[in-house]
């Protein structure tokens, strides 16, 4: 059973609707933060860990519009944008000696297919709309959510497919990493493994 009033928390009181719970709450500012807040912690883990990213130097955002009919924009201020592009810039890190630009796209927006990746290869995981492209001077690394199915593409060279641990085991998934980090306590080795700690 769900205690609806408790679930609403500090948000304005409203009647229960299946259009909000159990899934779509993510797209409303009173309850969630849109696709970026919902999925970035799973998708951006790979570049954050691989490149040693910390806080950004600056962020720029552009959002898509929704039209109900010709030239009539549907603006819903309580709802997160239907699509967005967020450009996040970082200074060089201990793992990368040049500045890094990270571009987040959601709502069906996708980057151009890099030349180094064969046209029939998925960007990220097979049959998934989510993924990561890390584009460097010598090649491209692609992976899916949670860093799964990583591949290294280098122009004119054979694709390298990396093995990743099976994360279907309950002892080794993002839920348990988060719980173990909390149990071990702030500043512990387990806590430091969490790429998005709640230190703010």
Set out the residue ranges of the language-model regions:
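Glycine-rich, aromatic-lined ligand/substrate-binding cores of catalytic
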Residues: 3-189, 193, 197-198
């Amino acid at each position: 059973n769900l205690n609806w009033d408790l679930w609403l928390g500090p948000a304005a009181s409203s009647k229960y609707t299946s259009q909000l719970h159990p899934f779509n709450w993510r797209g409303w500012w009173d309850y969630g933060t849109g696709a970026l807040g919902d999925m970035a912690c799973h998708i951006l883990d790979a570049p954050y860990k691989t490149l040693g990213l910390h806080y950004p130097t600056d962020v720029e955002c552009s959002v898509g519009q929704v039209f109900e009919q010709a030239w009539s924009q549907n603006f819903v201020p309580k709802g997160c944008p239907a699509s967005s592009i967020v450009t996040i810039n970082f200074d060089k890190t201990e793992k990368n000696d040049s500045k890094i630009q990270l571009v987040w796209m959601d709502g069906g927006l996708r980057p151009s297919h890099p030349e180094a990746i064969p046209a029939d290869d998925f960007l990220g995981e097979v049959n998934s709309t989510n993924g990561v492209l890390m584009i460097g001077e010598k090649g491209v690394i692609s992976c899916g959510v949670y860093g799964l199915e990583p591949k290294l593409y280098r122009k004119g060279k054979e694709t390298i497919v990396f093995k990743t641990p099976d994360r279907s085991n309950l002892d080794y998934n993002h839920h348990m990493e988060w719980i173990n980090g909390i149990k071990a306590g702030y500043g512990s080795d387990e806590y430091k493994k969490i790429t998005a700690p709640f230190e703010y």
